[in-house]
Design a protein with these regions (language model features):
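Beta-propeller-forming repeat regions
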Residues: 1-201
Length: 201
């Protein structure tokens, strides 16, 4: 729906008109708002894979919907992790799955897996990607088993990982910069009833 400036006239008897963009997306769990080439768009993940939704320039035009990957995914982020000028996909495979992976674009313009975390991470849930301490990083957390919060980055020609903390079980992760210009990560550690804040120097 196109949101008007004033929503006061809308209620249960007079609702905004919603337009279906796409159906047939089972377990459409993941949503990631992002900007690509200056255009705001969204990644949506489901059993059918990873889709990129790009809004039209005019409300009367159609949205562009592109399937980037046909691998069942719970959540995804898109970021140029290795600084090669192409956007990689960081995904949690399957619904709340245990496989953390990164896909890159091959010479045919298709996404193919280039990295996978070497061990299973039960019930992966928290996910974020962006610039952290001057480098592109992929930060994730899982809610069962070892309950790690992990940062993945491209170092010396390969993906390397760093464990931020263990035995916590992050369900969501938020990143921002404070007034002093320091990177902050806030993790909602659901499994231990804790909200943790990390200040990176």
């Amino acid at each position: 729906a196109v949101l008007p400036e004033n929503l006061d006239d809308f209620d249960e008897n007079n609702q905004l008109k919603l337009v279906k963009l796409k159906d047939g997306m089972l377990k459409n769990h993941g949503y990631c708002a992002t900007t690509i080439d200056g255009v705001e768009c969204a990644l949506v993940t489901c059993d059918e894979g990873v889709f990129l939704f790009t809004p039209p320039e005019s409300p009367v035009e159609q949205w562009e919907i592109k399937q980037l990957l046909d691998v069942p995914a719970s959540d995804a982020v898109i970021c140029d992790f290795d600084s090669d000028g192409k956007l990689e996909l960081g995904i949690i495979e399957k619904f709340h799955g245990d496989v953390l992976s990164i896909y890159r674009i091959n010479d045919q313009g298709k996404y193919e897996k280039c990295w996978e975390y070497p061990e299973k991470l039960e019930m992966l849930h928290a996910i974020w990607a962006g610039t952290l301490c001057g480098k592109k990083r992929f930060v994730v957390g899982n809610r069962r088993g070892n309950r790690k919060t992990i940062a993945v980055s491209w170092e010396a020609g390969e993906y390397q990982t760093e464990i931020i903390e263990e035995n916590t079980g992050a369900a969501n992760i938020l990143h921002f910069m404070n007034k002093e210009g320091k990177d902050i990560i806030v993790a909602a550690n659901r499994e231990i009833n804790e909200v943790a804040m990390f200040i990176f120097e």
